[in-house]
Amino acid sequence: MIKNWRITGDTHGANSLRISYLLENEPELIPEETALIILGDAGFNYYLNKKDRRNKAETEAKGVYIYCVRGNHEARPGEKLGMKLVSDENVGGPVWIEEEFPHIRYFTDWGFYNIDGLRTLVIGGAYSVDKYYRIANNLQWFENEQLAYYDREACLRNTEGKHFDLVLSHTCPLSLQPTDLFLNFIDQSTVDNSMEVWMEELAHNMNWKLWLFAHYHTDRIEWPHVEQFYMEIESLNDIVVRWTRYDETGELDWWLPISPKMKRMMEGE
C-alpha cells in the first residue's frame, strides 16, 4: 500500500536521478510504500528503443512506484508498446503497465482516480511549441501529442457539474498559463492552444479544489489552489494542507515562489 505520495514535474528521462534525490533527502521513506507522480514528460517512451529500456530498468531498480501523466514529448502508453491495462488499487482506477517494469505505471489519457483519498481527474497531453524545429531536425515529435478531440468531448461530458479534490495535468487552462514564461523566440501565433482553451471550459464546467500541472519548466504557485511543478518534489499531503490553511488564514509561507499574477493579486493590485 502506498503511504507516501510525492509530486514532481517534467523529468525528460532523468527518472532514476529524480528518485535518488528524493530518497537521499527523505531517507526515512520506504520505497515500496512510496509513489512519485510525474506530471508529464517522464520520457520513458521517448526514443522507443533500447535507451528507453535502460531508463526503465534503472528506474524500476529503485523500488519506488512511478505514476506518469502523459506529456507531449513521449509516446502514448498502450498495447502497441507492449503494455496492458490493469486496475490499480493504489489509485482506484486503470493504469498501463509493462510486466517487466511493474513499478512504472501510466495513467490513461484522461480518467477518474482516487489518490490518497482524493477524488482525482487526470488529463494528459499538450502541444509542443518546438514542433517545427523538431520536425526540421529529425527529432522526436509525436503527432498525437495532444489529447484527442473525442477524448476532450467525453471528458467534458463526464465531468460536468462534478467535484474533484485534485486535478493532475501536463498543461493547464488558458487563464492559468504562465505567459511570462513564454519563449521570446517562439511566434505565439503558430502555437496551437486549443487544448488550453478546452481546459478553460473544463475548469468552469466542474468544481475542483486543487490543480497541479507542469510543462512550462518552473516550480511555483500560479494562483490560489494552482501549482506548477518542474524540478521540485513535494508531498501531496503537504500541498493539500497548505491550501487548507490558506483558505482559513489567507496566508502562504513567505518563501514559496509565486507567479507575477499571484503576487499582484496578493498585493491588491
Regions picked out by a protein language model, each given a short descriptive name:
Residues M1-R6, F112-V122, L166, W223-F229:
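Beta-strand-turn-beta hairpins that frame and shape the catalytic cleft
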Residues L17-I19, Y47-K50, G78-L81, Y132-Y133, ...:
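A short acidic (Asp/Glu
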Residues M1-Y21, Y127-N138:
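Short, charged N-terminal beta->alpha structural module
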Residues D116, E200-N205, Y216-E269:
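Binuclear metal-dependent phosphoesterase catalytic core
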Residues N90, V95-W96, P102, D116-N193:
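Active-site-proximal loop/helix segment associated with metal-binding centers of metalloenzymes
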Residues M1-I2, P31-E33, G63, G117, ...:
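A general structural motif
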Residues I7-D10, L36-D41, I66-H73, F107-T108, ...:
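Active-site neighborhood of phospho(di)ester-bond hydrolases with catalytic His/Asp-centered motifs
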Residues T8, G13-I115, Q188, D192-M195, ...:
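Core catalytic region of metal-dependent phosphoesterases/phosphodiesterases
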